C-alpha cells in the first residue's frame, strides 16, 4: 500500500521483509 519502507527498488527488488516494489520505491502492502 502507501507506507514507504525507506527503501528504493531501482533494481526491481526490495530487501525489507513485507515490502514490495512500487517503482521506484518500496511500499508495505
Swiss-Prot record:
Keywords in alphabetical order = Disulfide bond, Knottin, Plant defense
What the entry lists under PROSITE patterns is as follows: CYCLOTIDE (PS51052), CYCLOTIDE_MOEBIUS (PS60009)
- Which InterPro entries does this chain map to? Cyclotide, Cyclotide_moebius_CS, Cyclotide_sf
Q: Name one Pfam family in it.
A: Cyclotide
Position of cross-link Cyclopeptide (Gly-Asn)?
1-29
Q: How is it modified after translation?
A: This is a cyclic peptide.
Q: Name one GO biological process term.
A: defense response
Specify whether Lyase is a keyword of the entry: no
- Give the disulfide map: 5-19, 9-21, 14-26
**What's the record's remark on domains?**
The presence of a 'disulfide through disulfide knot' structurally defines this protein as a knottin.
Indicate the family of this protein.
Answer: Belongs to the cyclotide family. Moebius subfamily.
Job description of the protein: Probably participates in a plant defense mechanism.
Q: What is this protein called?
A: Cyclotide vibi-A
Q: Which organism is it from?
A: Viola biflora (Yellow wood violet)
